[in-house]
Amino acid sequence: PDSGGVFAQGAQAWGHRRLKIMDLSESAQQPMVDPELGLGIVFNGAIYNHPELRRELEAKGYRFYSHGDTEVLLKAYHAWGEDFVSRLNGMFAFAIWERDSGRVLLGRDRLGIKPLYYAPIAGGLRFASALPALLAAGGVDTSIDPAALNHYLSFHAVVPAPHTLLAGVRKLAPGTLMRIEPDGRRSERSFWALDYARDAADESRSFEDWTEILLDGLRAAVRRRLVADVPVGALLSGGVDSSLIVGLMAEAGVKELRTYNVGFADVGGEKGNEFEYADIVAREFGTVHERIFVPEQELLTRLPEAVAAMNEPMVSHDCIGFYLLSEAVSRHSKVVQSGQGADEVFGGYHWYPKLAGSADPVADYLAAFRDRDYDEYLATVNPRWHGVDASAAFVAASFNAPGADDPVEKALRLDTTVMLVEDPVKRVDNMTMAFGLEARVPFLDHELVELAARIPAHHKLAHGGKGVLKEAARKLIPDAVIDRPKGYFPVPALKYLQGPVLERVRDALSSQSARERGLFRKDYVDTLLADPSAHITPLRGSKLWQLGLLEWWLQTHVG
């Protein structure tokens, strides 16, 4: 971070660590207090339409003393009350306090791009962007939340809000405001919901019509995310999604666009990088491109740092990749655009076609996505943690909620509003912010997400998935990148646990702390340790790494 600040008044205290991206002057310092309006704010994120909102507010007579987005939030709250959030385009977590009433308002953006954790404590409430910050002063219940444990081990490590693995720490759900009264009473309300309803005009549009409409929406989303007082770069994996973003940034006129790609050592014949495809795109658009190669030894040496940086345990193998990539990128860039969200929003995953016309979409979704069924979960954890099958109940409730009738769209909605929030987006925000790097995700522009929800599912499933997005991409990026086999962010050393990582996992699971916590059955752990590569989840993750990482994270942050 570039600077920090603290403000205390009566029973309330506020702290902030600032990354200077919009308005680099001291005028935009936080906590920001406006004595004239009797309001103060701490805010993490970026409001891309702040110039337009500023002009509206100036027309109402508001005077500004800074040029960034933070002050716009304060004035907007004063002008429009809590409904001001519906006018925001961006990613945000904020706390606004009213001097005279003593009331506090917490808010989190629609797609949960920015985190907001809170912990009720004796006589008060703590909140923070980082979960470990809540634990630093003690007094927080760090026992395990049984429902969260079931989610973590069953639902591909997705722990939906308000749960975290710690019983005393909650997270504000995306698209939610929490009002806190001076006497401590709390109330929440949702200000956004994703709806897959479409009118007759939407139904009648052709694939080609949707391609053009989508391309316009993509252009707007990428252009909005160029609003900054520092250069904006891009993470370029070599896949369709990040390549399309680079193409759109180049089309928007970004000069000397910096792009970055990370790769790892091959393991057991499995390729650890996709440099060749990123190079094709970098050459096509003349970017200032950097290949970042991480030797296996560095990966293993730096893994403890990545675990320490995690707000919650994140089992995806690419977490360490994003951590090391972010460190390298932060030497040259403060802001990057990144391609998370396209698979969830536009239907790129392999389970969506299986759901088309499904008679039992809940069962079919769980069969494809779940790491363990309930019987295996009962065999994994000790009896005191058995409880209910929280993840299956959660999926069923989500699929039965109004707003999505088609089985594919039920899955798209759940993946966009929950899985995406709690896995790829959380991972990227957490690991980039560890190095003061801001990642902006144009595929999660809420207007683009709403547009995508109107596109009929069969257009998304076309051409092997993401059909309408791929067709839009053909107008900008090379076919070789679009027609390649689907890739991912490969870190083979974590998929096939062996050597030092296996020993670290073994140590974590056999430690005194693990025995005292008593989460896992010894016979189950021994079975996994005997042959780690034989126990892989349907989504190709290591079951042993899930257990080991959870214990490692708890030992790092809780003890």
Where are these regions (language model features)?
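Cysteine-centered catalytic environments shared across enzyme families
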Residues: P1-M310, F322, R474-K475, A480, ...
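Conserved S/T- and glycine-rich ATP-binding loop of Class I adenylate-forming
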Residues: L236, G339, L420
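Active-site nucleotide-sugar/metal-binding loop of Leloir-type enzymes
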Residues: A328-S330
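Short acidic/histidine-rich active-site segments
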Residues: S333-D343, G347-Y349
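A mobile, often basic/glycine-rich helix-loop segment
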Residues: F346-F369
